A protein has these predicted regions:
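A generic "binding-loop/recognition-motif" signal
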Residues: 62, 84, 131, 209, ...
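Terminal amphipathic alpha-helical/low-complexity segments used for targeting or macromolecular assembly
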Residues: 1-49, 138, 144-145, 149-159, ...
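Extended beta-solenoid/beta-helix repeat architectures
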Residues: 45, 50-51, 72, 82, ...
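N-terminal capping/interface segment
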Residues: 1-16, 59-62, 68-80
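Flexible, glycine/small-residue-enriched loop-and-beta-strand segment within the central core
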Residues: 72-187, 224-225
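C-terminal/domain-terminus segments
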Residues: 190-214, 218
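N-terminal extracellular ligand-recognition/capping segment immediately after the signal peptide
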Residues: 56
């Protein structure tokens, strides 16, 4: 009975997969209890239907907009001090120990961060969103991924690099993208729709739809037909 109820809850929340028959009922009860506590904590802190785990920090909450059924795992920090509204799409997820940093220095007010519907990132992901990060719908990502949406200027030999300021273009990822673990995204890069990014890649360029990319720096390895 509990399994059937859990399956109905999955379908209602937009999850299309079928529950494995080998999953014990005790695990389902444990998950339901944890999700209930997270939902209660999220509602008390945001007044929205957000599943918020323990030890999370939300800075400038009024500039953070949550869709339905957003999950923020434990020990996540979200910096809402930025020019644009931080947006989390429906059923999106941020893995534990991740950090969204929008304004890292008082010399530049950051742009912001957006993630679409049904998109999720794994644990220990760093979003340097001062130059802006946009992630589309149905994007799945592994752990230990980093985004760096600005670059330090270094062309003036008469000044220290740290005194030359920064430039930023932003980072964009399309819809239906799979990103492997430990990928690094550099400022100005963009990934098209229906793409795969191999684990460990360093992405600095703009890539079209329907490709598999990988390597340092990342290059097109194969087209998806």
């Amino acid at each position: 009975m509990i399994k059937k109820l859990f399956q109905k809850l999955l379908l209602k929340s937009g999850k299309s997969y079928t529950l494995d028959s080998n999953i014990p009922t005790s695990l389902i009860v444990q998950i339901l209890f944890k999700r209930f506590i997270m939902l209660l904590r999220g509602y008390l802190k945001t007044h929205k239907r957000v599943f918020l785990d323990r030890n999370c920090i939300l800075l400038n909450k009024k500039n953070i907009k949550f869709g339905k059924n957003v999950t923020i795992e434990h020990n996540v920090k979200i910096d809402g001090f930025c020019k644009e509204t931080i947006q989390f799409g429906n059923n999106s997820k941020i893995g534990a120990y991740s950090w969204i940093s929008c304004t890292s220095h008082l010399s530049k007010f950051g742009v912001g961060f957006k993630i679409g519907n049904n998109s999720g990132v794994g644990k220990f992901t760093e979003f340097g969103a001062s130059g802006g990060i946009e992630i589309g719908n149905d994007v799945i990502m592994g752990s230990y991924i980093s985004f760096h949406s600005e670059n330090h200027n270094f062309n003036d030999n008469s000044k220290l690099i740290r005194e030359q300021g920064v430039t930023s273009i932003g980072i964009k990822i399309g819809n239906n993208v799979w990103v492997g673990a430990k990928v690094t995204f550099l400022d100005g890069c963009a990934i098209g729709n229906n793409c795969v990014v191999a684990a460990g890649a360093v992405v600095k360029d703009i890539f079209p739809d329907n490709v598999i990319i990988g390597g340092i720096p990342a290059k097109i390895l194969k087209e998806i037909k």
